[in-house]
Amino acid sequence: MKTPIHPTRLVLEENGDFHKSPKGMLFMDPLNGQFTDLSGVRILRCGVDTVRQLYNGKLRPEVMALFDLSVDVVEFAGYEWSKGRIGRDSGYQYRLQNAEMGLILLIKNHNIKVDTIGSHLKIEVSPHAIDGADPRILQGVLDDLAAAVLSHCETNQAAVHIALDVQGWTPPADLVDRMHCRSRRVRQISGIERIEFDGNASVYGRGETYMFGSANGLQLSIYNKTLQARATDKLDYWESVWATLNGDPFGDGDPAYNPLETVWRIEFRYHHSIVQQFSEGSRMASGEVIGCRTYEGLCPHLQGLWNYACEAFRVLSREGMYDAFWSLISLDARVQVECDPLIERTEYRRYYKTAKGFSGRNCEMFLGQFVSLIARERVPAKKAIESARKLEFWHVIEDHYLAKGWTRRDLERHIHKLMCDRYLRKGYAI
């Protein structure tokens, strides 16, 4: 198949005339004259979603000793970590996790002996640790942690996920048919009830996702980010990012993010082996190969990786012609790499969770357990409600039910009904 071309971008003047513009949001197929208006599409964010930095070295005995302790939380390298064993599918045996820092340390390669030098460490970095962080400082934090885990420590390679979040666009029903890529592995999942996102199971109502390529290569995933963020209790965080990080690059200055609209994510996932191929095969203007082995070293080349992926996976409107939306994100999306020191962004990254930021399952589960306890103690309904209102987080429970159209009086009746049901059907809580 011949190399596809981009549709012509136009701007409509007040006098009704059209003229070409690299920022035009009207796209015209020069062969058949068909127009596509993308003026309603807003690019919210294009940036790194996940970093996985790999290290080689020999495991320090004092690190392995942490996993023999009977406690669940340990202090290591000046921070507190939740520790545990992990499944063999991850390739590693143990983990140290600090969700506040946004870091997970995967330790002890399953296939290498504990006293042998090898790829014994992978550090996974979450979005909230990446956004706004100077790559040099972030890399320093990772390297310091790696040196505390491994002796003879050296960087191996980095894997990276680059994600674009948009509103005003929905994947077309024939996306799979119009997608052209080398990979034969294509998955379309409709009516999702369970799907894996970065190794974490998320329970959905209904949604849709598309995946092209394999996890050990270059993979493209297109999915409903609003649903995924709500299912994993991360919607509040992402709303704070979408509302403040980036404005509408093509509009009149109005906020780009609309909380009433769905956000779709286009995410390219580069396995570390693919990054290594780019590192060894790409040359700079000086003729020198890139040769990077760290996230910091990869940052200047993220835009190039984005552009490459948009060509490796092509959505076409017809043979030889890019789809207008794919043309837009290929030409206009700019990978954002922040350069603010970690210490200067601490307060800026702060946000507050709300009841609408997740499915509400936690609220309903809490209320059920709460009723069980007060029923066991035979606490009268009126006194139970008064006690509940004194809880620091009771407003979150109320907000959840108010969002469902209930009144506070409805919630009180619901609690009373649950208590009566416990007494009549069970006699006491079990």
From Swiss-Prot:
Domain of life: Viruses
Cellular-component GO terms for this entry: host cell membrane; membrane
Subcellular locations according to the entry: Host membrane
Keywords assigned: Host membrane, Membrane, Transmembrane, Transmembrane helix
Main location class: host cell
Transmembrane residue ranges: 207-223
Membrane topology: Single-pass membrane protein
Purpose: May play a role in phage assembly.
Record protein name field: Uncharacterized protein ORF430
